[in-house]
Swiss-Prot record:
This is Venom protein 22.1. It comes from Lychas mucronatus (Chinese swimming scorpion). It comes from the Eukaryota. GO terms for cellular component: extracellular region. Expressed by the venom gland. It is found in: Secreted. Keywords: Secreted, Signal. Belongs to the non-disulfide-bridged peptide (NDBP) superfamily. Long chain multifunctional peptide (group 2) family. Residues 1-18 form the signal peptide.
Length: 61
């Protein structure tokens, strides 16, 4: 086998191993770090929804 054949085989081996590495599930190092900020982002829409429900109840009285 000549050098070009070996290089082609090496290329495909590296390509396949790279795809296998990408298929592994990644561990989330900072799983709960952004949770507080995530919850804070939802407080405002919830407050708006509560205000809309209150105004709807007042309107229907």
């Amino acid at each position: 086998m000549d050098i070009k054949g070996l290089l082609v085989i090496l290329f495909f081996v590296l390509l396949i191993t790279g795809e296998v590495e990408n298929m592994k599930p990644k561990k989330h190092k900072y799983k709960y770090k952004n949770r507080k900020r995530f919850l804070e982002n939802f407080e405002e829409p919830l407050q708006k929804r509560d205000m809309n429900e209150e105004s709807y109840e007042l309107f229907n009285q």
